Every structure is written in C-alpha cells, then in structure tokens.
Amino acid sequence: MKKKVMLVFGTRPEAIKMCPLVNELKTRESLQTIVCVTGQHRQMLDQVLNTFNVVPDYDLSIMKQGQTLFDITTGILERIKAVLEEVKPDVVLVHGDTSTTFVTALACFYLQIPVGHVEAGLRTYNIYSPYPEEFNRQAVGIISQYNFAPTQMAADNLVREGKDPSKIYITGNTVIDAMQHTVREDYTHPELDWVGDGKLIFITAHRRENLGEPMHHMFRAIRRVLDEHPECKAVYPIHMNPVVRKAADEELGGCDRIHIIEPIEVFDCHNFEARCHLCLTDSGGIQEEVPSYGRPVLVMRDTTERPEGVKAGTLRLVGTDEEVIYKNFKELLENQDAYDAMAKACNPYGDGHACARIADILEGKEYQPWVAE
C-alpha cells in the first residue's frame, strides 16, 4: 500500500517552495501525493500553482476581503478537519511559518496525524519579530515528527530546543530547487526594457511589523538614493495590502526612477532577481533567493531568521531606520569593494536537491545531508 503524503499550503511564498516538492513526490511510486491549499492568499497563490502545473486536490478557499489572523485561523481549523478525516494521510507536510502552517499542524495534532515541517528550525527567538511567523514556526516545531531543516544552523536550533536529532534532517532549501525551473537566459519583460543599460534595483516590502512609520522610513530612504543616482532604476512589485499601497503612493509616487507594478508571478520574480544589481527587501524567501544569483541583499528588518546569509556576507541587516538604509544603499552603489564583498560571498542555502532528499526520507531511504561550502 502506498504511503499517503498530504501537503498543505496557502500563500505564495509557501507555494514557491512546496510546488517543486509536490512534483518530486509525484515521481515516487511508493508515495501517494495529495495537495490541499487553504487559499490564504488567492490571486498570488494561483499564479504559482500555474507556474509549476500543480492542481490541488482540495481547496479550502478561506480568503476574504479584510481577513484578520482570527479569520484565517478559525477558517482553516473549521474546514481542514473534514479533509484530514477523508484523506487519512500517513503524514502531512507543512512549510515554514504561515498561519496555514500553524493551524494545519494544530489540526493534525488534534487528530494525531504525523507532521513533517519543511524549512524547520528558523528562529529569531522574538515572537513579535517577525509577527506572527516566529510564534507559528516555534509552535509547529513542538508538534512535528519530521523536521526538514534547510541548514546546519537551523538544525542546531532544533537540537538546542530538545528535538530528537534522529528526527532532524538537513536538506537544503527547496526554493533553490524552484529557481532551477524558473530562471531563463532568454527572459524578456517590458520593465527590463525600461531599465535598459541602467542598474536594476529590485524592491519588495510588505511585512506586517513594518506597516506604519517603519515603512515610510524605508521608502523615504530608497527615494533619496534613487534621486541621487540617475544610473539606477527600481522596480517594486507591490503587495496587495492597501496599507502598503498607501505608504508607497505617499513616499514614492511621482519618482520617475521607480516603477511600482502589480504583483508578478514567481517566474518573473526570479528572473528579475537574477538580473538586479542589488535588492532591498523585508521578505524572508528573497533573502535565500537573491544570493543564489550573486547579488547583495539589504534586509529592511530588525531581525532575521536567516543568519546564515548574514554570516556568509550575502545579506546585510539594515533595519527600518531611514538614515541607516540610506547609508548602506548608497555605499553599495558608490563603493565597489563593498559591493563585491557581498556579491561574491557563497550561497549557504542549498544545491537544488532538497526535494529529492525529502522524498528519500519519506520513502525510508538513506539520504546525504546538505553541507554548505
């Protein structure tokens, strides 16, 4: 009898990292792969599913306008019980730190279904930064039986927390697997035509804890540097959150060196990252993606759960203070040595075989842990 492996995810970042795993698991004859999406993000989730040709078996469709964390939590918990009871999976795989991940793991705990946590062990140890993600992933870490840590540092965190080392597997990050299928040398886009021979600055900003004054500080710093550097052109695919859009309009509106565009598909996002001069972000996943292309990343957050990149030199944590962001952004444009030191640092996040390692583990096969250079 085939082992039933159910994957549950609901947001764009989860889908980017889980869809390659879905496709890998479906190649394994000993496994039956079932996909359930919660629809925590709707439009942005569907874009990724289409890119990787993944068709969900179940869709909870929980998203509604103006949804709160309470809405997401109760919506998933109420709807996923019936799916789990119908499928009766042998293991449920969740990813990272979203509300979908936390609530699904909680439902599995209530039904005593084993949980596999993909991208386990990331920590800031401040449950309000990032919020609510840090709490979510710590809570899932208590429940999970399989812990697929992307790096040695993530695995070490789990060991310090008392997890059984025999249930911790260092796999690399599945996002590196995803990028092997999305980046194209012959890629074209109207925004790249607009940038031309200039330096592309790729921007993302959306974090819940940065809403309000921190985001205004971030945008003001970016605009100041762009105003001083005519060789730079910035592209910012803006998040759907109306609070983010209002802040961007107030601080970046009318700046002819930045194009604020609607959310782009993962295929476009990865190709923009591969072609940028540098990236400013408060995203989690982009901290892993952009270093793979040898591009510096300024992380506009006070904490990061990805210290490997900071240690390796590919990431620089700059917080949300306007002057600090301005100074660091300006330095990377004006100091070639500083730029090269970040651009040439090694990528500590994976080799593109994380999904195969996870599949091997679920099949009970021997696996070779991922070891960074």
Please report, for each region that a protein language model flagged, where it lies by residue:
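Nucleotide-activated sugar donor-binding and catalytic core shared by glycosyltransferases
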Residues: 1-236, 241-373
